[in-house]
């Protein structure tokens, strides 16, 4: 039974104003959670909250810059003050970054991608974990990618960051497994989000062709796996990396 499995629990979702993050926030709210919609774009976060409130959910818009530890700390504090003890977190905020080979990759672009996609996950867990422990335990899902275990030419920073997320997830899970906190990572394939909707048709077709399922993923499919990992149905699952990729990694 999944209908209201998160009733009474507070969840913080970063990058939650659109795409996968919004799908996760919507699913958790629909199953009873109080959700902090955390995003760099406060106006977009407020729009998402309005949509959640329209379906009867309790939600809070929180502005956060995951590259700034002080901003992340403040976002976690605001969440707890506004919605109550934190027991669930989804660290989803991320960017794609520039496309270039390693030998020609701009160091500033490298730092920008790592700061968001890897440092941001560390900062998020750094400030979420004390609150989750104080709440008596809970679960975290970090959004990695199929590129968390595979290479992809032209995306060295993104691939390195997403590999790092998988490693960080495993280490953190070991540290907190005996304290009632589970930590897992999700590895989506290419998902039909706003980031890809404006892609060149040929490039989009090439991405679709990478998936034996013959299509891009849907944000709701990633949200479904994420919600499962956060739930008590996954009570013996921690420290692992879970694919939702239409067969991409099976090739």
Go through each PLM region and give its residues.
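Short C-terminal tail/terminal secondary-structure segment
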Residues: 2, 96-99, 150, 210, ...
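Canonical Rossmann dinucleotide-binding motif of NAD(H)/NADP(H)-dependent dehydrogenases/reductases
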Residues: 4-36
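C-terminal substrate-recognition "lid" of short-chain dehydrogenase/reductases
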Residues: 83, 122-125, 215-244, 248-249
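Substrate-binding pocket helix/loop in short-chain dehydrogenase/reductase
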Residues: 100-102, 106-114, 196, 207
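Active-site helix of classical SDR
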Residues: 125, 161, 169
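Alpha-helical segment proximal to the catalytic Tyr-Lys
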Residues: 130, 174-178, 235
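Residue(s) in the substrate-gating loop at a strand-loop-helix junction
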Residues: 145
């Amino acid at each position: 039974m999944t209908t209201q499995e998160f009733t009474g629990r507070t969840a913080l979702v970063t990058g939650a104003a659109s795409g996968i993050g919004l799908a996760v926030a919507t699913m958790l709210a629909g199953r009873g959670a109080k959700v902090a919609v955390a995003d760099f774009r406060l106006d977009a976060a407020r729009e998402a909250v309005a949509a959640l409130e329209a379906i009867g959910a309790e939600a809070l818009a929180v502005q956060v810059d995951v590259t700034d530890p002080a901003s992340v700390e403040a976002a976690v504090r605001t969440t707890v003050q506004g919605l109550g003890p934190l027991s669930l977190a989804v660290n989803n905020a991320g960017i794609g970054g520039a496309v270039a080979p390693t030998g020609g990759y701009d160091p500033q672009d490298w730092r920008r991608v790592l700061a968001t996609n890897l440092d941001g996950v560390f900062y998020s867990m750094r400030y979420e974990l004390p609150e989750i422990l104080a709440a008596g335990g809970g679960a975290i899902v970090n959004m990695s990618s199929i590129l968390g275990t595979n290479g992809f030419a032209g995306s060295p920073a993104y691939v390195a960051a997403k590999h790092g997320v998988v490693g960080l997830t495993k280490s953190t899970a070991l540290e907190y497994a005996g304290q009632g906190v589970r930590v897992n990572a999700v590895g989506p394939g290419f998902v039909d989000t706003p980031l890809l909707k404006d892609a060149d048709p040929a490039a989009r077709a090439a991405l679709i062709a990478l998936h034996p399922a013959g299509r891009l993923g849907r944000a709701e499919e990633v949200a479904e796996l994420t919600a499962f990992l956060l739930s008590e149905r996954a009570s013996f699952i921690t420290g692992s990396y879970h694919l939702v990729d239409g067969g991409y990694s099976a090739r």
